[in-house]
């Protein structure tokens, strides 16, 4: 299928092997976060997330009901600073929230204390400052740093039933139910070893479940009726009879069924079929005998009362025995609880037995008879042990636990899950529990225990949902407001007099809200430093799903099941992409086509199948909706009309693969690639790679550094374009039009919409630093005169090539050993790659220094630094800052700074020096910013911020002037273009209309009724034009005025835009208190490929560069071309990533076919265009590429030439995941490219020129350079800083630390008997302070190293002992001998 037919870009043609035309475009990869945040801030004009949160907290009343605070409305302001400013100045990109609050003062009746009316109403607007705003690139800027809030995958609220192995009794299963709210107390129901049903609230002590029911207001009889079928036993002629109910005998029958006369109608142990039961009823069986032995262990359902005295003989739930039965026989009938019925057991009866004892004790201590009140008190005591309690407080407490919307929230999702699981019909707006919920949950748990219910799988995606940024922020806001609500209530109690003077602002402290939100963004586990290495890292970071974070799992405690791939992940969560290490399986990524619905459940797309015919209707289903449906894979054979060819299809149902008839199939996968996520779908031939290697491949693509020149892969998957489309790095046209002007820094597009012409301007960003210090640079990919559509990519970002993601380079590789240098995955690289800067990347480092206001004076940024040689400051400008373009080496001064010294009385010598050299010399101390040991590069930019009220230095003024000039030029260019366009349109208008009078236009005279020539009209100036227009009809004059007005308005808009930019430029710099000047220096470093750098392919085939070989020494092909990279063939078989072999085959085909197209260009025959078209059609002659063929036929000569030039460097292929090139197609391509069928070739040794004995696999593979660069890892130290207490060298490159010589290394030296080395390690190279000083002195003077002293560790130990009040004395060995 050709992706060029609907390709918005049209810059590159790929030979696309996908089988299935894309039914729906891949949804925007970042829509989940965008939609979620828009909902939170009400950017889609519904009820916003913020409003919901406010309404859940307000109104707040005071305890005496005198005052109430109500929320009226909220309004969101505009951001004060632009994104760029926030990043440069270390600010937060945020908005202010204006909240309107109403305070009502009520009139109260003095006697009754009830509200009588309203005394006063006050409304006030309260500002909540700094609510971070999401940027258009779906990230947040917090204190100048770009961060991402990761989506959380957590357990959905609702009810869940589990079956687990008992921790106390072997081989016994324990059944539990949990009601999980979004906010509030958890409720656990659980069986114990003795089959008693208990309940726990919030993991506190368990109480029998009947205690909870009683606390909810149920009487004993009500509970029995709710849980047990009541069976009435009639006493006739000393026999116990009951009505025949076939449902009681659905399972195996425990006793013979006898009729009234004692005749056996059905024997015990035999199954009673439905047919047999109907027959028995037909035969007149109404009453059957209830065996006494069964009756003996039953319980009474209702109390038995003596009819004469009215005395209760036996209470309900009395266990029947022979003596009791003898007494009961006097009654005509009695009721028993049928605990032998289907799906019930004795759990509730056992619970009553347990709670009876507790209630008896409570009755005595509390002097209350009502069991419901006692139960409430018992629950209160369990939840708040040790607190005194009264019954009303206990009842209110139980009610608050589950039925108060302020304390308990199931959310809409939880209510939906409860209703679905328990078959309830509670309206979805009821987000608190109901009594029915609790009863039904206990009932269902009993059913589960007795094999009748369905056990839930907590890893099923129907039981896990996604909390995105909007919901996470709403939760944080709720926490902040809850804190504020508590503070307001406290303030209410302290208010006594002067209630009339109270204003809303006195009660509300908005800081509480702000700090909660800022804490979430700066310290929350889900708010992360954005991974910005390349566009892919950024996109996948924003699509990440984490099971960790607040309210989620803890990685140390997460088991294997949670981390494992679940059947419901299909099409929803990528099974490949997850980190290696302790977070494996806890951090996942959304699949490519997956969407998240309003309730937070992940949906996968399918096409509907009706009677074996695939329709074009696409449906998105959640894991729960998909249960029980038959789903066919996308690879199912379908004819041209959409009918499934084969009668039986391998379909999926609930995670199982089964053979289903085609008529039974209800859905079919949208496409094969829907299973995997974005990063995995970039790996061609993924289906041939082992899962572990695919995981490494998808993770390593995120670590690829942007290279100096990007080039798209020859073997792609078609996904490269989608990522470039949704990543913010590329510049996309906002509106369609024609490219009017383009240079390296800007693009101007002239277009026309309903209102008329307009000009859009796009600036190219250059040399910006990303979070990972990679270089961010944009360059245009359109030419002047190109027609551009809205949404089209007009400029590439980093790691992009012609609007496609390009994270690496196509390299010619050979799988062969090379003198042992590619042992253990090492990589041998040709010098040509280094010489041509193929894998060179640019990294930008930021260094900053502040000048502060100190008590002794102010620090100064200056070139005038004491005790520094002239040549050391030669590269600084007059203001003391390194000039742009300076080559920086380690130890050089980047910014000169002097700090005032505290005033000490000067010595006579100092006074003399000051008298000679002026005041400055002795007062200040050098505090300059120096380049660190590993920093080397070129200064590319400098930013200077000066506090208001302080004078700007020359450098800052120059920088300001330069930026202002650039803005003025851009504005001037746009105005010129507008003027030119206006003149052209006016001339076009007048050239079509006839004159009303004789006129001289330019050099020609025109008579009345003639039309002027457009070339003459274009020669005249504006002023002449205004007089000329009067010679035309009123209609033309009106059209002219409309045109003029439109252009006038457009110019006003441009002026307003320009003024806004100038205003931003002229804004005062905001700096932290005490800082008067901030200087940031940006240094760009070129990192060429070096020995020790890590490289990788896309299939998890990683390695370290082991040697760089001269081009002449590398093995070469028969045509003389030498190989770029030699890889070890042993890296393939055991790793099982065969995808790399297929990729290199297809890559070689692309190169060879490209060479053939280049030959046609080189020959440049008369009809070479025909030859080119024929060649390109030949390449697309494979049946699967019919659409490409049609497309190439439809191209104009100019377009064809454009695509052919691109193909001459290598024909680009697109082999989507699971739809790659097959064997037959490979053999056709090999023939076309004139490659041997085994894909191998003869090679010659570069050093000897001899032919290598075996034929070698040579191909073209896409290689990446990863950000584990040797330059950033290599580190050496001779002397340096030491730890304060232990006096041992500090550790780590960042602190310029030493290499740790640990316990095990000491053992190694002991084993070798290397005593002197060992002594040196433990003393002068570690913590012998005097020893190391004298050793250093001796070495510098060329003397012998003196004897070592006592290590500091010894003193640390003795001082530790002294701190324990132990007197420790140290004796010298020599003194001891005396």
From Swiss-Prot:
Similarity section: Belongs to the RNA polymerase beta chain family.
GO CC annotation: DNA-directed RNA polymerase complex
GO molecular function: DNA binding; DNA-directed RNA polymerase activity; ribonucleoside binding
Reaction equation(s) it catalyzes: RNA(n) + a ribonucleoside 5'-triphosphate = RNA(n+1) + diphosphate
Record's subunit section: The RNAP catalytic core consists of 2 alpha, 1 beta, 1 beta' and 1 omega subunit. When a sigma factor is associated with the core the holoenzyme is formed, which can initiate transcription.
Name this protein carries in UniProt: DNA-directed RNA polymerase subunit beta
Function, in words: DNA-dependent RNA polymerase catalyzes the transcription of DNA into RNA using the four ribonucleoside triphosphates as substrates.
Record keyword Transferase present: yes
Organism: Campylobacter jejuni (strain RM1221)
EC number per UniProt: 2.7.7.6
InterPro entries attached to this UniProt entry: DNA-dir_RNA_pol_bsu_ext_1_sf, DNA-dir_RNA_pol_bsu_external_1, DNA-dir_RNA_pol_su2, DNA-dir_RNAP_su2_dom, DNA-dir_RNAP_su2_hyb_sf, RNA_pol_bsu_bac, RNA_pol_bsu_CS, RNA_pol_bsu_protrusion
Domain of life: Bacteria
Keywords, sorted A to Z: DNA-directed RNA polymerase, Nucleotidyltransferase, Transcription, Transferase
Gene Ontology BP, a term: DNA-templated transcription
Enzyme class, broadest EC rank: transferase
């Amino acid at each position: 299928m050709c992706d060029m037919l609907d390709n918005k870009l049209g810059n590159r043609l790929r030979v696309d092997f996908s089988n299935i035309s894309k039914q729906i475009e891949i949804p925007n990869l970042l829509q989940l976060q965008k939609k979620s945040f828009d909902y939170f801030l009400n950017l889609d004009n519904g009820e916003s997330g913020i409003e919901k949160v406010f309404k859940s907290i307000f109104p707040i009343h005071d305890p005496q009901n005198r005052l109430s605070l109500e929320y009226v409305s909220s309004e969101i302001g505009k951001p004060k600073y632009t994104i760029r400013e926030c990043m440069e100045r270390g600010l937060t990109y945020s908005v202010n929230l204006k909240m309107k609050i109403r305070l009502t003062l009520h009139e109260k009746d003095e006697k009754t204390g009830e509200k009588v009316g309203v005394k006063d109403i006050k409304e006030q607007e309260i500002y909540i400052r700094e609510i971070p705003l999401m940027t258009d690139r779906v990230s947040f800027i917090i204190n100048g740093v770009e961060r991402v809030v990761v989506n959380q995958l957590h357990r959905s609220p609702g009810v869940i039933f589990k079956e687990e192995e008992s921790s106390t009794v072997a081989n016994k299963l324990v059944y539990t139910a949990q009601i999980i709210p979004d906010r509030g107390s958890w409720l656990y129901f659980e069986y114990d070893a003795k089959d008693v049903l208990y309940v726990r609230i919030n993991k506190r002590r368990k109480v029998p479940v009947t205690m909870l029911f009683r606390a909810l207001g149920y009487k004993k009889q009500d509970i029995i009726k709710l849980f047990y079928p009541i069976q009435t036993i009639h006493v006739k002629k000393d026999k116990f009879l009951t009505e025949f109910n076939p449902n009681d005998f659905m399972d195996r029958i425990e006793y013979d069924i006898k009729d009234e006369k004692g005749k056996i109608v059905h024997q015990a142990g035999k199954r009673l079929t439905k047919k047999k039961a109907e027959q028995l009823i037909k035969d007149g069986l109404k009453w059957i005998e209830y065996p006494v032995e069964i009756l003996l262990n039953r319980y009474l359902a209702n109390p038995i009362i003596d009819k004469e005295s009215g005395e209760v003989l036996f209470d309900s739930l009395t266990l029947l025995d022979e003596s009791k039965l003898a007494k009961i026989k006097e009654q005509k009938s009695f009721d028993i609880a049928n605990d032998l019925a289907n799906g019930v057991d004795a759990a509730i009866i056992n619970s009553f037995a347990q709670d009876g004892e507790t209630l008896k004790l409570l009755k005595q201590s509390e002097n209350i008879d009502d069991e419901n009140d006692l139960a409430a008190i018992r629950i209160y005591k369990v939840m708040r042990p040790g607190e005194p309690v009264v019954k009303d407080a206990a009842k209110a407490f139980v009610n608050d636990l589950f039925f108060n919307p302020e304390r308990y929230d199931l959310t809409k999702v939880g209510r939906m899950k409860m209703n679905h699981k328990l078959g309830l019909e509670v309206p979805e707006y009821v987000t608190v529990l109901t009594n029915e919920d609790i009863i039904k949950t206990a009932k269902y748990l009993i059913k589960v225990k007795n094999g009748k219910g369905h056990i839930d799988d907590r890893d099923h995606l129907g039981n896990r949902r996604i909390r995105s940024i909007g919901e996470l922020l709403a939760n944080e806001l709720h926490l902040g407001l809850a804190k504020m609500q508590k503070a307001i209530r406290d303030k209410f109690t302290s208010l006594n007099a002067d209630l009339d003077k109270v204003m809303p602002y006195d009660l509300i402290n908005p800081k509480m809200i702000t700090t909660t939100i800022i804490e979430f963004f700066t310290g929350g586990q889900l708010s992360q430093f954005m991974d910005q290495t390349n566009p892919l890292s950024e996109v996948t970071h924003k699509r990440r799903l984490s099971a960790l974070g607040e309210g989620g799992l803890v990685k140390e405690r997460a088991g294997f099941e949670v981390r494992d791939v679940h059947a419901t992940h299909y099409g929803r969560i990528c099974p490949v992409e997850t980190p290696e290490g302790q977070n494996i399986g806890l951090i996942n990524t959304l699949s490519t086509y997956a969407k998240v619905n309003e309730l937070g459940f992940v949906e996968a797309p399918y096409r509907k199948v009706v009677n074996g015919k695939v329709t074009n209707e696409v449906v998105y289903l959640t894991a729960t909706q998909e249960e029980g449906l038959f789903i066919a894979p996308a690879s199912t054979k379908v004819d041209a009309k959409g009918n499934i060819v084969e009668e039986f299809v391998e379909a999926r149902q609930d995670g199982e693969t089964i053979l289903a008839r085609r008529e039974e199939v209800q859905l079919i996968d949208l496409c094969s690639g829907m299973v995997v996520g974005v990063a995995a779908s970039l790996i061609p031939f993924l289906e041939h790679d082992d899962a572990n290697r695919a995981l490494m491949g998808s993770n390593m693509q995120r670590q690829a550094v942007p290279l100096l020149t990007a080039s798209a892969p020859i073997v792609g998957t078609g996904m490269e374009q989608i990522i470039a489309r949704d990543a913010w790095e590329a510049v996309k046209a906002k509106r369609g039009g024609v490219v009017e002007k383009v240079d390296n820094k800007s693009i101007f597009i002239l277009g026309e919409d309903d209102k008329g012409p307009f000009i859009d301007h796009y600036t190219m960003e250059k040399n910006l630093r990303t979070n990972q210090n990679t270089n961010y640079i944009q360059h245009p990919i359109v030419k002047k005169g190109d027609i551009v559509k809205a949404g089209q990519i007009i400029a590439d970002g980093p790691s992009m090539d012609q609007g496609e993601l390009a994270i690496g380079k196509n390299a010619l590789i050979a799988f062969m050993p090379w003198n042992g240098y590619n042992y253990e995955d090492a990589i041998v690289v040709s010098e040509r790659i280094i010489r041509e800067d193929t894998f060179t990347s640019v990294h930008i480092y930021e260094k900053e220094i502040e000048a502060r206001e100190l008590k002794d004076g102010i620090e100064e940024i200056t070139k005038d630094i004491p005790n520094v040689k002239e040549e050391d400051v030669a590269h600084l400008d007059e203001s003391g800052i390194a000039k742009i373009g300076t080559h920086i080496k380690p130890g050089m001064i980047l910014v000169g700074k002097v700090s005032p010294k505290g005033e000490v009385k000067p010595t006579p010598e100092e006074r003399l020096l000051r008298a000679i050299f002026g005041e400055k010399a002795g007062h200040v101390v050098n505090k300059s910013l120096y380049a660190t040991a590993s920093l080397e590069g070129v200064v590319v930019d400098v930013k200077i911020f000066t506090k208001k009220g302080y004078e700007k230095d020359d450098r800052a003024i120059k920088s300001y002037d330069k930026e202002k000039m650039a803005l003025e030029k851009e504005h001037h260019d746009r105005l010129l273009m507008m003027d030119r366009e206006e003149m052209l349109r006016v001339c076009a208008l007048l050239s079509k209309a006839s004159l009303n009078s004789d006129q001289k236009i330019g050099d020609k005279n025109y008579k009345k009724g003639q039309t002027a020539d457009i070339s003459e009209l274009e020669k005249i100036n504006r002023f002449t034009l205004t007089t000329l227009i009067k010679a035309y009809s009123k209609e033309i004059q009106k059209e002219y005025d409309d045109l003029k007005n439109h252009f006038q308005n457009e110019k006003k808009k441009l002026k307003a835009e320009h003024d806004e930019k100038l205003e931003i430029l002229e804004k005062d710099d905001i700096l932290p208190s005490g800082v008067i000047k901030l200087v940031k220096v940006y240094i760009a470093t070129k990192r060429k490929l070096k020995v020790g750098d890590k490289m990788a392919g896309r299939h998890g085939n990683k390695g370290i560069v082991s040697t760089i070989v001269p081009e002449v020494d590398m093995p070469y092909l028969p045509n003389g071309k030498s190989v770029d990279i030699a890889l070890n063939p042993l890296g393939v078989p055991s790793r099982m990533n065969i995808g790399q072999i297929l990729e290199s085959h297809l890559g070689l085909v692309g190169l060879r076919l490209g060479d053939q197209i280049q030959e046609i260009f080189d020959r440049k025959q008369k009809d070479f265009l025909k030859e080119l078209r024929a060649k390109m059609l030949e390449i697309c002659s494979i049946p699967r590429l019919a659409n490409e063929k049609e497309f190439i036929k439809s191209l104009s000569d100019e377009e064809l030439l454009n695509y052919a030039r691109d193909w001459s460097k290598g024909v680009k292929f697109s082999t989507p995941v699971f739809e790659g090139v097959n064997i037959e197609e490979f053999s056709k391509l090999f023939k076309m490219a004139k490659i041997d069928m085994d894909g191998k070739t003869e090679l010659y040794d570069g050093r000897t020129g001899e032919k290598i004995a075996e034929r070698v696999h040579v191909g073209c593979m896409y290689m990446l350079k990863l950000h584990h660069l040797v330059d950033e890892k290599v580190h050496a130290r001779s002397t340096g800083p030491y730890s304060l207490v232990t006096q041992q060298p500090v550790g780590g490159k960042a602190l310029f630390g030493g290499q740790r010589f640990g316990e095990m290394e000491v053992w190694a030296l002991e084993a070798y008997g290397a005593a002197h080395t060992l002594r040196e390690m433990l003393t002068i190279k570690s913590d012998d302070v005097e020893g190391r000083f004298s050793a250093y002195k001796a070495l510098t003077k060329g003397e012998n190293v003196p004897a070592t002293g006592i290590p500091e560790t010894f003193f640390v130990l003795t001082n530790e002992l002294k701190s324990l009040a132990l007197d420790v004395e140290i004796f010298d060995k020599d003194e001891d001998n005396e």
